[in-house]
């Protein structure tokens, strides 16, 4: 697997130590000193997520903790970590990351239909639309809105680590 998007000799990475990781189920490699974001970019991965409301494609635009688009889910099970910022995640052997706010995949997202219906979703529409009947809020409206909100999935099992 070539890394056509990586500079040949410069940078602060250790090219003697290759590190393998998975992103969205596919295996890639990077080097010691890479962040998840830099390794993804080196492997030609530019699409990492979708916007909250309209599910528009999102890629990297920052290089630090201020990155607004590259939020990923790390690992799975009890050790899962939602909303990790890919530009600040150090690449380690066996890292498993997935895109958030997309289904069935980041490249083909059914939620993107919202983009076509944007005339029906003005800013703040949900504050007025889902007011009646009152008892629908917690059982119907809120779960649907939360699922579409683009946040990662919190761990369902207790934390296995001892502190």
Regions found by a protein language model. Name each.
Residues 24-34:
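Short, contiguous acidic and Ser/Thr-rich linear segments
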Residues 52, 56-163:
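Fe-S ferredoxin-like electron-transfer domains
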Residues 21, 29, 58:
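Short glycine- and Lys/Arg-enriched binding-loop motifs that mark or flank ligand-binding interfaces
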Residues 19-21, 72:
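A short beta-strand micro-motif
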Residues 1-17, 38, 42, 47:
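Terminal leader/tail segments of proteins
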Residues 30, 49-50, 54:
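General beta-strand structural signal in soluble alpha/beta enzymes
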Residues 22-23, 163:
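Short hydrophobic beta-strand segments
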């Amino acid at each position: 697997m070539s890394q056509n998007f990586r500079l040949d000799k410069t940078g602060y990475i250790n090219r003697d130590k290759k590190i393998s990781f998975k992103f969205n189920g596919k295996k890639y490699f990077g080097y010691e000193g890479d962040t998840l974001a830099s390794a993804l970019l080196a492997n030609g991965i530019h699409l990492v997520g979708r916007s909250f409301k309209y599910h528009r494609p999102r890629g990297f635009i920052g290089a630090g903790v201020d990155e607004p688009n590259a939020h990923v889910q790390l690992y799975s099970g009890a050790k899962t970590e939602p909303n990790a910022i890919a530009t600040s995640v150090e690449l380690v052997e066996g890292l498993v990351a997935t895109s958030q706010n997309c289904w069935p995949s980041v490249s083909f997202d059914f939620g993107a239909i919202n983009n076509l219906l944007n005339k029906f979703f003005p800013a703040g529409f949900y504050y007025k639309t889902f007011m009646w009947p009152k008892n629908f809020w917690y059982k119907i409206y809120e779960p649907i809105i939360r699922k579409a909100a683009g946040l990662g999935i919190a761990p369902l099992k207790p934390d296995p680590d001892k502190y």
